[in-house]
Amino acid sequence: MTQADELRRLAAVLRAEARPDLTYMEVCGTHTMSIARYGLRELLPDSMRLVSGPGCPVCVTAMADLDRVVALARLPQVTLATFGDLIRVPASRTTLAAERAAGADVRVVYSARDAVQIAADEPAREVVFAGIGFETTAPTIAASLLEARARGLANFSVLSMHKTMPSPLKALLELGETSISGFLLPGHVSVITGTACYEFLARDYGVAGVVAGFEPHDVLRALLRLVRQTTPAIEIEYGRAVRPEGNVVARRLMEQVFAPSDADWRGLGVIPGSGLALRPEYAESDALLRFPLELEPPLEPAGCRCGEVLRGVTDPADCALFGARCTPEDPVGACMVSSEGACAARYRYRGLDD
């Protein structure tokens, strides 16, 4: 059976078994892109709606945090290293790309270890790694920080803007803006966290969840699992990579370096305990403490509905800026910049994902 045949078969089963008025939310940016790329919405029954959630790390980074990154990049002694997606995300008044063009030392790296090596190669520079992401990337950044300390690289520091995934799901359910029937839970994050952290969804809110892989058949199979649940529960579809216990070693490494902290999420505001701050014993490597900055109040772009898209209450195409004033080439909001953003996915695959 070809992949196309399998997708048609799964879609037919979904159409036959789906109940009325189902709304499922995917909370992983890679799922968002896969759903758009393969036009999966077109295969779903009319009674089923898929909405995007707060699963894109760049997208959920608050404007105030982006402004801090820009301010750090402007310091003459600082080399600002970060992942490529962050370069073009609009802060209140500029972007890292614009600052680099104006002379700031901003470098794209593929891992935090690359930033550690820059610090080793250029001891006269203060190398700051701007870290974003969820539990997927936090352990690798923790390992890089420990490596820098072991190598005696006092010129390396981390600005941690990391967030933890289960927290925004609770915030969304508490808000109650969208009636969510179930969640497509993130595969990469769950490799690290396991599934125990999601149990509250079914226990406290009566909302089901299935950890899904990223191939189109993974997504449809996960949706079918959600449809077939008679009692809300947390299941794993992505069994080839995810175990209920997760990656204990990676979590211990993360917990050695980071501690829970309050974090500001685009579209959701401050969620207590949803961030990852460096522990006090790593204060000398904490760019937030090492480079105290006075920042102007953040400015949100007029008309941008990225925050609503991240909460699942607005479809990207319903934003007046979408595809006109806001495009991947000239983005207004973060959801149009990131490769995992809902607006970027919808724009790139428009026609397939309408």
Q: Which functions belong to the PLM regions below?
A:
Residues 50-57, 156-163, 210-217, 237-240:
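A generic structural motif
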Residues 28-31, 134-136, 162-166, 187-191, ...:
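Glycine-rich beta-alpha junction loops
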Residues 49-52, 106, 151-158, 181-183, ...:
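Short hydrophobic/aromatic-enriched beta-strand-loop microsegments
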Residues 177-242:
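A conserved active-site cap/scaffold subdomain adjacent to cofactor or substrate pockets
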Residues 121-131, 136-186:
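Active-site histidine-anchored catalytic micro-motif
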Residues 220-308:
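Internal helical hairpin/lid segments
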Residues 65-68, 120-127, 171-175, 198-200, ...:
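Short, surface-exposed amphipathic charged segments that create phosphate/polyanion-binding patches used
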Residues 1-124, 138, 150-151, 159, ...:
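Metallocofactor- and cofactor-centric catalytic cores in central/energy metabolism, strongly enriched
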